[in-house]
Design a protein with these regions (language model features):
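A solvent-exposed, acidic/Ser-Thr-rich amphipathic alpha-helical stretch
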Residues: 42-53, 62
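A conserved amphipathic terminal alpha-helix motif
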Residues: 101-104, 120, 126-152
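Short beta-strand segments that buttress and anchor functional surface loops
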Residues: 52-60, 82-84, 123-125
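Solvent-exposed residues in well-ordered beta-strands and their adjoining turns
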Residues: 9-13, 56, 113-115, 124-128
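Short, solvent-exposed aromatic-acidic interface loops
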Residues: 85-90, 124-130
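Hydrophobic-ligand binding "helix-grip"
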Residues: 46, 60-115
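Hydrophobic ligand-binding cavity/cleft-lining segments
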Residues: 1-41, 48
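Intrinsic-disorder/low-complexity, polar/charged segments enriched in Ser/Thr/Lys/Arg/Asp/Glu/Gln
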Residues: 3-9, 52, 66, 79, ...
Length: 152
């Protein structure tokens, strides 16, 4: 697994950015910025520490797929740590086997820093070799979309 890092500065208070990124006041804000990964991107579950959460979308065949994850840490307005430990395929959760093993135990962490009303988000994530290029191309665009949402 490769460690990747992305960041963006957003001219909005950290509370607004955190709530929009996680879709806490409206899931639509989460779905809007993550639509760059999958136009039907959403989540089922809770952002509470220790909770299971599914990051899901529908593929071109109309089948639901995505990732099975756990919120390892959530310090409101400061830090969120997500551990991916399975996948959703054809609407079924798979948490073991060769497909899962290559990227299971990967983390995706969000750090929020306030600097005089400007919020910096730092995203640290683990990616398998076959996803590095995709993440390097897509994650910055998704963070720019989040910036656009928060600065409205």
């Amino acid at each position: 697994m490769k460690k990747l890092q992305f960041n963006v500065k957003i001219n909005a208070p950290v509370s607004k950015v955190y709530e929009a990124m996680l879709g806490l006041k409206s899931k639509l804000t989460y779905e809007e910025w993550t639509s760059l990964f999958n136009p039907t991107s959403t989540y089922d579950g809770s952002w509470n520490k220790g909770s299971k959460i599914l990051f899901i979308g529908t593929d071109e065949k109309g089948e639901r797929g995505g990732m099975v994850s756990e919120i390892v840490e959530n310090i409101p307005y400061q830090y969120v740590s997500i551990r991916h430990y399975g996948l959703v395929k054809d609407d079924k959760e798979i948490t073991e086997g060769p497909e899962v093993e290559k990227w299971a135990r990967g983390f995706e962490n969000y750090s929020f820093k306030d600097n005089n009303g400007i919020t910096e988000i730092i995203v640290d994530l683990d990616a398998t070799d076959d996803f590095v290029e995709y993440m390097n191309q897509t994650f910055p665009k998704a963070l720019e979309k989040l910036k656009e949402i928060c600065e409205k």
